[in-house]
Amino acid sequence: MKSKYSIFCMFLLRGFIFLGTVFSLNSAELRLKDIARIEGVRENQITGYGIVVGLPGTGDSKTPFTSESMKNYLKNLGVEANLKPDQTRNIASVLITATIPTYSRKGDKLNVVVSSIGDAKSLEGGVLLQSPLKTAGDKTYAVASGVISFGGRQEQERGSSSRGNKKTVGVVHGGAIVEQELDQNFYASERVQIQLENQDFTTLNAIVSKIRSILPGKHGIGPESVVPISPSEINIVLGKSFENKSDAFLTLLSDIENLTVETQTKPKVVINERTGVIVMGGNITIEEVAVSRSGLNLSVTDKNRRRNWLGKEQEPTKSSFLIEESTSVGDVVEALNKVGASTKDIIAILEALKKSGALHAELEIQ
């Protein structure tokens, strides 16, 4: 049974973007590769230190190691320079982070995140100089450089003080080039271990049953070889019948990845504080609860009664939000947008609803 969905709301209101998705079904048939991974096939974190140049006077001004780093960088290029901390307003020190897949090859490009570690006001307009990226073992696997870009838009006209408006964190798309491949020992094992992204006994049981019904007939693997070892792990014992990197082994892995199982959709609300985007399932409901937030007044009734939208109060006193049981998160966010609530207000209210137990969904703030 395929999941049907439609976008039910997309609007821009005072610099705040709201996206909602309505799922008509609570379950969906998904491929195994979409909800789990095979052990050994994973991403690895790499990080490094770098310098951003070309800033329009928004760089570091009181960060001594920035001038020292720039001086050493120029020295390696054969240029002698005596920079002082107050002469670095067009450069900034940053930390660089990226993820590298296990099977990345030399020359592959990766996106990198660049974050200011000094007192720079903004990295907008800056260029990251060539910087090595290493793992925890201090081995260089990639080199990053390029123009820093930013997503979303500022909310200054709404009076928001979100740290996302300062633009001290940006992305260099395809800015890192892989120079060294990761060590691989995936094929050394005589088993395949499947790891679910989320612990769920219902999904685990469905996967085990599906694998046991398909593998014996096509690949000659007995049902007893498929063993669940935890709420999120399944072990498939292959023995020596499959040679490493053989066509039969690769076909087996492909068949496992493309098995389809019916899963339950997990209610989730995702908020990106930097860009002001909210994504949620349309059927996420809220129990009856009272919420107070200074300067706003909202009253929402249940689905069988007329809704009453109220704007900002004239008096700067605390206001009450009456949210009836079965009201959806989408209704609440839409109402808050109508009365001019900021991103900070919406995040604070949703966090309070979650902590009180009124919001029955996972809340993720990015």
Swiss-Prot record:
- Keyword terms, alphabetized: Bacterial flagellum, Periplasm, Signal
* GO biological process per UniProt: bacterial-type flagellum-dependent cell motility
- Tell me the domain of life: Bacteria
- InterPro entries in alphabetical order: Flag_FlgI
Cellular component GO terms, alphabetically?
bacterial-type flagellum basal body, distal rod, P ring; outer membrane-bounded periplasmic space
Keyword Iron found: no
GO MF: structural molecule activity
Is the keyword Signal in the record?
yes
Signal peptide location: 1-27
Where is the protein localized?
Periplasm; Bacterial flagellum basal body
PANTHER family, per the entry: FLAGELLAR P-RING PERIPLASMIC PROTEIN FLGI, FLAGELLAR P-RING PROTEIN
Q: What family does this chain come from, according to its entry?
A: Belongs to the FlgI family.
Q: What does this protein do?
A: Assembles around the rod to form the L-ring and probably protects the motor/basal body from shearing forces during rotation.
* Assembly mode: The basal body constitutes a major portion of the flagellar organelle and consists of four rings (L,P,S, and M) mounted on a central rod.
Name it: Flagellar P-ring protein
Q: Which organism is it from?
A: Leptospira interrogans serogroup Icterohaemorrhagiae serovar Lai (strain 56601)
Q: Which gene is transcribed and translated to give this protein?
A: flgI
